[in-house]
Design a protein with these regions (language model features):
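Short acidic, Gly/Ser-rich segments with clustered Asp/Glu that frequently serve as metal-coordination loops
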Residues: 83-89
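Compact beta-sheet-dominated globular domain cores
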Residues: 113-117
Length: 396
């Protein structure tokens, strides 16, 4: 079978492949994002206003045992969505007088549903991509050139070993990362970050597309909410989708969606007194939440989206590893700058989120204290779909 690098050199006289070591970038901890909201800009406001209807100046709210118990019979959350990606370093390639990293990735976005006590897969999106420097296309032919390359790659795969054909593997897309941006001294490390970012952007684009599909199919309503694993604060500067079709982030799609982050920056916003909220978060008692605070997020389209953010402690655990163990960050999209979420709705959502934390995945995931069990199952479902890394790397 003719490998991708061989085809790339054959089709591009201006490219030289060095055939350096191939490896999984994800195995390098320096490439792993520590917080779900690591790229979120801390609020510059001296104080942050409440984004719930109850405006009492109390720092925390207790979720009553009665509410937690009464919501167990009919869960509010029906759908659970997670995105995952593996990134690979394929080679160092010479274009002109500069060396660039060439990467690949496998992207999986999955949604599971729970209906009548049965948990099953609802939707799955999966693709293999190449992440290459923008000048891989020396003639700037754009999509026709990239499609021609993909056709040649995939034809070679189809003519390869039968075992590979049985898996139905194909390379679906070539992503092109920026190589300039007004900086002439960019190094390999920066290019590598851009390579990974392009794959990450593709994954988050398809998370949003899947949310849109659920809305268009009429599956999300007042009685059937979606938990999205991670933040729902999407910046359109970090998207691979053309500007004229970025309607995937229509705000109406998120009316019945809650973003739940297991890891977060506790200093993202200040409280109503202008003090760091991290102290209040760390001191939350079992089944207690912070007030809902308004957070303005620049969308990258010249406007802002406004989110209601609160933090919730999920468990009665006297032996937690850190003060932030078993606390999750919860996000909902607000209706404009002055929008608020009804306090009773926040408490109802919080009670349901607490119930989703049981049973636990203790012993199976080091993040068990901050995990919601249906989200854990959805994550496991997505990751079970990954092809073996050696198979992916051997394509190239």
């Amino acid at each position: 079978m003719e490998k991708l690098l061989d085809i790339l050199e054959k089709e591009n006289s201006h490219i030289r492949c060095y055939r350096t070591k191939k490896y999984s970038i994800d195995e390098n901890t320096s490439d792993i994002i520590e917080y779900d909201d690591i790229n979120r800009k801390p609020s510059e406001l001296k104080k942050t206003s409440f984004a719930e209807t109850e405006q009492t100046n109390a720092p925390t709210v207790n979720i009553s045992n009665h509410l937690i118990t009464t919501t167990q019979g009919k869960p509010l959350f029906t759908y659970f969505l997670d995105g995952s990606r593996h990134c690979y370093m394929i080679d160092d390639i010479l274009i002109g007088d500069k060396i660039y990293p060439l990467g690949g990735g496998e992207i999986i976005v999955g949604c599971c549903s729970r209906k009548d006590g049965k948990f099953k897969s609802e939707k799955i999106f999966q693709q293999i991509v190449i992440s290459a420097p923008k000048n891989i296309d020396d003639k700037e032919d754009g999509e026709p050139y990239l499609r021609s390359l993909l056709d040649k790659f995939n034809y070679s795969i189809q003519k390869g070993p039968k075992a590979l054909q049985t898996l139905g593997i194909s390379i679906d897309k070539v992503l092109k990362y920026a190589i300039d941006g007004g900086q002439s001294n960019l190094d390999k490390k920066e290019f590598k970050s851009r390579l990974v970012a392009k794959i990450q952007n593709e994954m988050t684009d398809h998370e949003q597309i899947m949310v849109r599909e659920l809305c268009n199919e009429g599956k999300l309503d007042d009685d059937n909410w979606l938990i999205k694993d991670g933040s729902i604060e999407y910046n359109q500067n970090f998207s691979n989708i053309e500007n004229n079709i970025k309607s995937i982030v229509e705000k109406t799609n998120y009316k019945h969606v809650v973003g739940i982050s297991k890891s977060f920056n506790p200093d993202l916003i200040k409280d109503y007194k202008g003090k760091k909220l991290s102290k209040t978060i760390a001191e939350l008692k079992p089944f207690e939440r912070t007030k809902v605070y308004r957070y303005e997020y620049q969308t990258g389209r010249g406007d802002s989206s406004y989110f209601g953010i609160w933090y919730l402690r999920l468990r009665k655990n006297s032996f937690r590893e850190t003060n932030f163990s078993d606390i999750v960050k919860c996000e909902v999209l607000l209706d404009g700058e002055t929008g608020k979420i009804d306090t009773e709705q926040v408490d109802l959502l919080s009670a349901n989120i607490i119930n989703e934390a049981y049973p636990t995945c203790y012993g199976n995931d080091t993040r068990w204290a901050n995990h919601l069990y249906p989200v854990y199952l959805t994550e496991k479902f997505c990751k079970s779909r990954y092809r073996d890394s050696n198979i992916i790397l051997n394509l190239f």
